[in-house]
Amino acid sequence: MLAHHRKAMAAYYAKVGVTSFAPASMTLPYEVLEKALANARKLADESPAGLSVLRGIQMEGPYFSYKKRGAQNPDYLKAPDFEGFMALQEGCGGLIRIVDVAPELPGAEEFIRQAKDVCTVSVAHTDADYDHARMAFAAGATHLTHLYNAMPAIHHRNPGVIPAAAENPSVRAELICDGLHAHPAMVRFAFSIFGGARMVLVSDSGRCCGMPNGSKFELGGQDAWLVDGVARLADGTIACSATNLYDCMVNAIRFGVAEEDAVRAASFNPACAISAESLVGSIETGKVADFLVCSADYADRRVFMAGQEL
């Protein structure tokens, strides 16, 4: 991504009230990931005034199940590779704060045991059964990427990943709350089984977020289109979200999630997931003075960064 594209993205997020962000990478060759991470580091180091601050990266791929790859490019999937991961992590100055892995892949357990001392390890794009999921969490994974999506559904005789995560109090679960990736009833259900302290709202938005309907864009080396507010690949697969995190939070409240739980899931909990809670995520003495002043119905907001209104 070019420098002006990175800054345009950060400017858009700040405008809508997302004052910090942690973008996700895609399943790509290491040499491409290396360049993308270097670009992200430049933006994080620059931190231009008035732009949303890049606090970390979620490495979403390439250690994924082919069956549950979703919109990830299958040509670049590979088994967990700690040496390769560490080369990328060191190359970007430790900016990777979450690394995703499908625990049923060969070498996944050892990868998790090693990577947990480097950053948060998340179970993602997986066809794992209940036992493999429990193994992953016992080995040190403490996060579940976009709950419900790119993983087996809950079944009473084959519970799978979701119950394994829910019954482990150390595991947080992400949820894309755009009204498309999960039904409102399943949003309420997620908050009821994980609790407000363990839910992390995410936008999962691609570069199409904020773009006009009909826009064509690139996603992990694949063409995608924004049609009627939905981002899709050429074969119709949902590519990503086109909703920002503020709107995801408002959606959660409108879907029936307690206001305090939705706000926490869009602020403090994600800050904890990327080890940024000492800086952001809540209004406390010594933290960065980033906050929003919202109308009662959340239709309007005033955005403050470092104590200054944008």
PLM ranges: what are they?
Residues 163-173, 191-203, 209-293:
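His/Asp/Glu-enriched, well-ordered alpha-helical/loop segment
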Residues 7-36, 52-65, 92-104, 120-122, ...:
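Divalent metal-dependent hydrolysis catalytic cores, especially in the metallo-beta-lactamase
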Residues 11-22, 65-93, 135-147, 151, ...:
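Active-site gating loops and adjacent loop-to-helix segments of metal-dependent hydrolytic enzymes
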